[in-house]
């Protein structure tokens, strides 16, 4: 029998009160909570939950991700493994599930609904998951929900395969996550009426308010790529009485150097610091994801699993101890989640490229280019005079217009897709990556074809990774697992990433806060407005490839 007691100020989120208590834990469960007469320094509360994250974007395998985030009081995540599914299919999903089971940390996976993000007609991924694949996944007790349905056209037009995937979740009483950025109210209503119940893509408060009025649960996102907290946090007080049950917090995509400094606890601290109701904020961070996704995570009630955190500071929420299933997984600066190494899996069929492969020409007077936005995954479409790129159609550094290319890594000798992008800011050199949402082909951007070719070939040689270079220096972070993840510990991969990011900004000249993260979303054709994938420039608004 494993029996112990905790004495601390008990934060009762449900009844909105705090009082000193003695809490008894037996065999991983809360068996009693008793008020006591004492003056105590520590506070105890349920653990934090990230309500939507792609663990692969941290470059960490699930066990090493868990090792990192327990120090911030995170006890569970709602995780969509669609990044690795695009590369390795169901084998990739099983890799994530099996690795996650080697720790106490609670990761609740969904069945990816859109692999690839739209369909194989629009882009090339390493695998395709059809409705039968999804239905088989939904049968598993390891799958808790249907992951974000990004093919909004398929939902609105009632595409049979898309609707079948949604119904495979609903018929099993599992929830369906949404992904609906920039839709009109009319189309939003059609999209949500299919049975989809959440959205984490709101970037304006007006969009979020409308979706809340439809009964949609809004997940406020503050990650490494998209940062929407500043725009959406007023909802917390607006929704205090009417919609408090309808909000959650998430990181979505987060790099390890960001998570080193904080996770959901950092969002909680900001929200409380902005004056929002203390208990409402904690309800959003600790309670709402458990109730919505119906996951077995304790809420610090009698009979619950003993998943809780202890802190002395309820302003910053710096965590002193984290418990999961009654086991101490973090204390006094030390994570007790083991670091685990795995045999890599991958999917790479791409041979060395030549400079001639990156040549581009057009007879069009005006051509569309991508206009990227700092700290956002949406872009704008800009039309420019093609003479700005004449005569050789490389980059125009003076106008900050750079060549961008996608190289199919799954089907060798495919034609390279080429476009142009503004606001990236590189002055001399190139950066590249196999983290290229969501199909994860090779994406490169640079100031001339020679740099583009060199960056591409370094990535091909290593079968995946992140790369930045100029004439003097080349930096590569190897990502041997699907070209997405490393088996290195979080601190080591975070240090490598910080060095790479500093090189991109301070040496290559990019003005973006996180150039590689921004680059990775320039191929995501389900987020407005203009993106590029292995088949060409895609106008998300008109839902078609552009002739340029």
Swiss-Prot record:
Keywords of this entry: Hydrolase, Manganese, Plasmid
Main EC class the enzyme belongs to: hydrolase
A Pfam family this chain is assigned to: Adenine_deam_C
Gene Ontology BP, a term: adenine catabolic process
Catalysis: reaction(s): adenine + H2O + H(+) = hypoxanthine + NH4(+)
Cross-referenced Gene3D superfamilies: Metal-dependent hydrolases, Urease, subunit C, domain 1
InterPro entries, A to Z: Adenine_deam (IPR006679), Adenine_deam_C (IPR026912), Amidohydro-rel (IPR006680), Metal-dep_hydrolase_composite (IPR011059), Metal_Hydrolase (IPR032466)
One term of GO molecular function: adenine deaminase activity
EC number: 3.5.4.2
Cofactor(s) listed: Mn(2+)
Family named by the database record: Belongs to the metallo-dependent hydrolases superfamily. Adenine deaminase family.
The protein's name: Adenine deaminase
Taxonomic source organism: Borreliella afzelii (strain PKo)
Lineage: Bacteria, Pseudomonadati, Spirochaetota, Spirochaetia, Spirochaetales
């Amino acid at each position: 029998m494993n029996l112990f007691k905790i004495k601390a100020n008990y934060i009762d989120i449900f009844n909105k009160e705090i009082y000193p208590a003695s809490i008894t834990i037996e065999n991983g469960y809360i068996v009693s909570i008793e008020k006591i007469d004492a003056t105590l320094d520590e506070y105890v509360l349920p653990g934090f939950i990230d309500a939507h994250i792609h663990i692969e974007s941290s470059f960490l395998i699930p066990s090493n991700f868990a090792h990192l985030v327990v120090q911030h009081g995170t006890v569970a995540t709602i995780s969509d493994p669609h990044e690795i599914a695009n590369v390795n299919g169901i084998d990739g999903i099983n890799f994530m599930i099996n690795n996650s089971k080697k720790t106490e940390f609670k990761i609740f996976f969904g069945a990816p609904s859109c692999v690839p993000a739209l369909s194989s007609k629009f882009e090339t991924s390493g695998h395709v998951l059809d409705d039968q694949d999804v239905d088989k996944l939904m049968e598993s007790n390891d799958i808790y929900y249907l992951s974000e349905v990004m093919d909004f056209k398929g939902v609105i037009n009632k595409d049979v395969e898309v609707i079948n995937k949604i119904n495979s979740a609903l018929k099993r009483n599992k929830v369906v996550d949404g992904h609906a950025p920039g839709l009109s109210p009319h189309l939003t209503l059609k999209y949500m009426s299919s049975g989809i119940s959440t959205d984490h893509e709101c970037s304006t408060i007006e969009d979020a308010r409308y979706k809340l009025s439809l009964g949609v649960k809004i997940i406020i996102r503050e990650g490494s790529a998209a940062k929407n907290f500043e725009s959406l946090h007023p909802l917390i007080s607006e929704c205090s009485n009417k919609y408090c049950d309808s909000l959650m917090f998430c990181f979505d995509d987060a790099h390890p150097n960001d998570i080193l400094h904080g996770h959901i606890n950092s969002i909680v601290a900001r929200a409380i610091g902005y004056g929002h109701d203390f208990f409402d904020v904690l309800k959003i961070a600790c309670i709402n994801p458990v109730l919505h996704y119906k996951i077995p995570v304790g809420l610090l009630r009698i009979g619950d699993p003993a998943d809780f955190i202890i802190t002395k500071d309820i302003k910053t929420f710096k965590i002193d101890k984290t418990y999961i299933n009654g086991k101490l997984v973090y204390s006094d600066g030390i994570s007790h989640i083991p670091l685990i190494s795995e045999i890599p899996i991958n999917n790479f069929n791409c041979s060395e490229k030549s400079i001639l492969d990156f040549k581009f020409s057009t007879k069009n007077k005006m051509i569309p280019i991508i206009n990227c936005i700092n700290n956002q995954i949406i872009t704008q479409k800009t039309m420019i005079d093609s003479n700005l790129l004449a005569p050789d159609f490389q980059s125009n550094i003076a106008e900050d217009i750079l060549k961008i290319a996608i190289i199919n890594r799954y089907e060798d000798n495919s034609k390279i897709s080429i476009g142009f992008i503004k606001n990236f800011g590189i002055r001399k050199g190139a950066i590249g990556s196999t983290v290229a949402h969501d199909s994860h082909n090779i994406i490169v951007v640079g100031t001339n074809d020679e740099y583009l070719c060199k960056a591409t070939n370094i990535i091909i040689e290593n079968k995946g990774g992140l790369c930045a270079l100029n004439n003097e220096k080349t930096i590569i972070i190897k990502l041997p697992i699907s070209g997405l993840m490393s088996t290195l510990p979080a601190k080591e991969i975070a240090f490598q990433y910080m060095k790479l990011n500093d090189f991109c900004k301070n040496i290559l000249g990019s003005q973006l806060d996180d150039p590689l993260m921004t680059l990775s979303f320039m191929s995501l054709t389900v987020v407005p407005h203009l993106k590029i994938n292995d088949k060409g420039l895609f106008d998300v608004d008109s839902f078609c490839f552009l002739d340029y």
